[in-house]
Amino acid sequence: PHVVNRWREQPGPGAGAWFDLGPHLVDQALRLFGRPLAVTARCLCLRKHSEATDNFHVLLHYPACEVVLHGSTFAGGPNIRFQVQGTGGSFVKYGLDPQEERLKAGVQPDNAQWAMENEAAFGTLHTETTCEAIPTESGGYQTFYVQLAAAIDGGGRAPVAVAEALTGIALIELAEESSRRGRTLACSSIL
């Protein structure tokens, strides 16, 4: 892939694939696993003429597991969205949430099919004895913005607590520092 003239591919603070996709992945990891003990990251510029991160591989170290956050502009074809491996089996999910593409196609959020995925996009749970398709739960980005508007108007709670947002930002910056320094960094310094 070629470098394109857009904000995330230009050098500077907050640019690159890690700052574009990373916050979403970090948020999901923090929601599922909490704050890690340490982080090891490699944020790289692999494309010719690239001045902003276009490939990242981040390990979040927890007491009983490691979480891998990975993104690359080189990934072609069907990409793994989630892969969870545990003692009871493995879960694999390909593809992206359908909401953005549906919105571009003119489908409105109040449509019953808004965030529903077809069976081909379901995740698969593999155990020692079975292989089972797991339907994706329906979501709605618009709920976040409704909650945010209510919080701004003073009539509701923010969809994300300030402390959670600050922890996410600190972890993103710590991962970038880990990559720059070439070593694992403890998360004790973040909120």
Enumerate the language-model features and the residues they cover:
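Glycine-rich phosphate/pyrophosphate-binding beta-alpha loops
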Residues: 23, 70-78
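C-terminal glycine/acidic-rich active-site capping loop/insertion
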Residues: 83-159, 191
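Active-site beta-strand termini and strand-to-loop segments that position acidic
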Residues: 58-64, 84-86
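A general structural signal for well-ordered alpha-helical segments in protein cores
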Residues: 25-26, 141-146, 172
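C-terminal helix-rich "cap/oligomerization" subdomain common to oxidoreductases
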Residues: 147-191
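Solvent-exposed beta-strand sheet faces enriched in polar/charged residues
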Residues: 39-42, 70, 188
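Short acidic/polar mixed-charge low-complexity motifs
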Residues: 35, 63-66, 78, 89-90, ...
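Predominantly a Rossmann-like dinucleotide-binding segment in NAD(P)-dependent oxidoreductases
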Residues: 1-49, 57, 182
